A protein has these predicted regions:
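Hot-dog-fold acyl-thioester-processing enzymes
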Residues: 2-64, 123-137
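HotDog/MaoC-like acyl-thioester-processing domains
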Residues: 3-10, 14-20, 75-79, 87-137
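N-terminal, well-ordered alpha-helical segments
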Residues: 42, 78-82
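Conserved interaction-surface patches within small, structured recognition/assembly domains
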Residues: 63-73, 81-86
Length: 137
């Protein structure tokens, strides 16, 4: 089962490895007071880069986001956890599923987690000169 084939009810727990954990703050909000989607994409990109870098043993870059779903808004004060799972390794590229889960620390049930965003990132391994190289060279 892949990220894009699942439904929220099918997989009620995070898939993959916890890669980033941070607090959503007021400076990251849009004009309506919710955390900006762009901020979430930035965190997901950083997590995908960390996961790809672990696999490739060095520098990587994002070449595509194949699919992304924003499932629910994120509120200020939420604890944001970004999970990554390596799905496929090609010659020079890697496909990484990224999920964002939140815990709303200020709500009545602060232990409840909710998936708010999911995406598949395509990353490539780079050499020291910024040229594409084999993932496992």
């Amino acid at each position: 089962m892949t990220l894009l084939d699942t439904d929220l009810d099918d997989v009620p727990a995070p898939q993959g490895q916890l890669t980033l954990k941070l607090l959503a703050s007021r400076q990251d909000t849009n004009v309506y007071g919710d955390i900006s989607g762009g901020w979430l994409v930035n965190q997901m990109d950083q997590a995908a880069e960390l996961a790809a870098g672990r696999e490739a043993g060095g520098r990587t870059a994002t070449v595509a986001i194949e699919a992304m779903d924003f499932l629910s808004p994120v509120r200020v004060g939420s604890m944001v956890s970004v999970y990554t799972e390596l799905q496929e390794v090609g010659h020079s590229s890697m496909k990484i599923d990224v999920e964002v889960w939140v815990r709303a620390l200020h709500e009545q049930h602060p232990d409840e987690r909710q998936k708010v965003t999911e995406a598949r990132f395509v990353m490539v391994a780079l050499d020291d000169n910024g040229r594409i190289r084999a993932v496992h060279d």
